[in-house]
Amino acid sequence: MEHGSIITQARREDALVLTKQGLVSKSSPKKPRGRSIFKALLCCFHTQHVVQSSSSTELTHKEEANTIAKSDLLQCLQYQFYQIPGTCLLPEVTEQDQGRICVVIDLDETLVHSSFKPINNADFIVPVEIEGTTHQVYVLKRPYVDEFLRRMGELFECVLFTASLAKYADPVTDLLDRCGVFRARLFREACVFHQGCYVKDLSRLGRDLRKTVILDNSPASYIFHPENAVPVQSWFDDMADTELLNLIPVFEELSGTDDVYTSLGQLRAP
């Protein structure tokens, strides 16, 4: 098994291309993050919406209404199906988290950056066994990750969901999440492999999608549920990055909503 198959990462050159195309937000140490993050989110699926809008002009008003109704019904059926015991990825909601929004948080290039090459200022060095040989993984923590996770744990039911393998991601999360913010951890086997990408299907969690949000640096990860997503720029080693710090007030605003679709839609509005 190759090193690259253990950790699922964004490439630095891909992140630069996406940033230039407006597919992800770019943080600035001088400006607080506000509603602009959600404008970036809309850009992620601009092409998809253009295709849909061009074809929708051929629909009658009645057909459009039926399409919306079918979409709502499908979402409802998916949610009800995963309420059947043993079919959902997450355990029952604890008493502590009753009524809270479930926030699904990615690991690599969202909270940390890891490398098999030595990093002088690594926050963690994690041994990972690959085909009988132990390799060292050097892990950098994104700036303000501790403050971000602490606040998220106070407000939400937090779930780690990574496309990396558990043999790497589990020990990294042990070191990163000292306070036990994550109620559950999901790894690659919980993803859906779709068109060459590991997709995090939120409908399989067993949570109401109206009260579920995903934070991820890869739009492909949430392609099934773009309207539940808060995008974040891929992080590699910029120690001046303030993305997580600037996201705290955004999530504080979301924490009191009963419908993330409505709240995220309002925040995306110009």
Swiss-Prot record:
EC code: 3.1.3.16
Pfam families (alphabetical): NIF
Site (Transition state stabilizer) location in chain: 162, 200
Binding site residues for Mg(2+): 106, 108, 217
Phosphoserine found at: 5
UniProt KW keywords: Hydrolase, Magnesium, Metal-binding, Nucleus, Phosphoprotein, Protein phosphatase
Domain FCP1 homology: 96-254
Record's keyword annotation contains Magnesium: yes
Cofactor dependence: Mg(2+)
Gene Ontology terms for molecular function: metal ion binding; RNA polymerase II CTD heptapeptide repeat phosphatase activity
Cofactor note: Binds 1 Mg(2+) ion per monomer.
GO cellular component entries: nucleus
Catalytic activity: O-phospho-L-seryl-[protein] + H2O = L-seryl-[protein] + phosphate; O-phospho-L-threonyl-[protein] + H2O = L-threonyl-[protein] + phosphate
Tissues showing expression: Expression is restricted to non-neuronal tissues.
Subunit organization: Monomer. Interacts with REST.
Functional summary from the UniProt entry: Preferentially catalyzes the dephosphorylation of 'Ser-5' within the tandem 7 residue repeats in the C-terminal domain (CTD) of the largest RNA polymerase II subunit POLR2A. Negatively regulates RNA polymerase II transcription, possibly by controlling the transition from initiation/capping to processive transcript elongation. Recruited by REST to neuronal genes that contain RE-1 elements, leading to neuronal gene silencing in non-neuronal cells.
Entry protein name: Carboxy-terminal domain RNA polymerase II polypeptide A small phosphatase 2
Organism field: Mus musculus (Mouse)
UniProt gene name: Ctdsp2
